[in-house]
Amino acid sequence: MVEKFVEYAVRSLATEPNQVRVSRSTVDGKDTITVQVSSRDRGRVVGRQGRTIRAISTIVNIIAAGGGSVSVTVAD
């Protein structure tokens, strides 16, 4: 469910929504959602000083409150 929200939010921001890829991994009990976007959309998804991706991450952590902390990152 959390991945679907991230995908929806990022696709809504992207100028090339068909290039958006979202994956989830767990390492040492920590969940990480990684977002891949086109280079043109990277700045738009990250936002000024990381505000946009941080806001998405905050919402994700509220949604996943019972399941622990989830990190959201944008792949290079």
What are the functions of these language-model segments?
Residues 1-44, 52-76:
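RNA-contacting regions in translation and RNA-metabolism proteins
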